[in-house]
């Protein structure tokens, strides 16, 4: 696994080059879309044949933030992040506004479909609405709590083509992540034991992104070649160390430690 000193957007362009080498226009999906900002970056970088955006855009998403009442002392209340969402977290109008903001970004893209549903309910809608059976890339950025992210990984692996990718957002342990009750890294650690996916690369950043692919896929070699021949600095470590990843914050920048 390559620990790359870069940002997630560079990964998108790297994978675009890999898809181009395979003469493929990828079919892609994003789970957890919010305003559509990252989805638009994915679209512009990957030039997909089709794209599916899946999000409930619903205050019901708050229900899974934590099973405990009162919250543990180390977890901040979900309402603490209302500023990021543009309004009260329990107000449907906040989510309706986010949904409309997202749609406005893709109004001229007729190959983009938005499905307003939670990630699991959306599965049975994908094929009837879009005709898509398999994705070449699924970006997972929906509910970040352990049980939910593990469920998304377990279900959506079956919708990923044999040589397809899963990209996972916010996959690190950090002080800020703990405040949000993130369980992404822990879910990935469990998923790797239950599947044939392996991590190929991770960004050396807070809120790290990870590229996953099946261990016997040709994409293991192609991504390795693409990174090795790029100008992206990296160090390589055994992928089994991914579960030890934690953010170390210094005065100048953050780094990922596996010690």
Question: Where do the model's predicted regions map?
Answer:
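S-adenosylmethionine/decaboxylated-SAM
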Residues: 2, 12, 16-259
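N-terminal pre-P-loop "Q-motif" helix
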Residues: 7-11
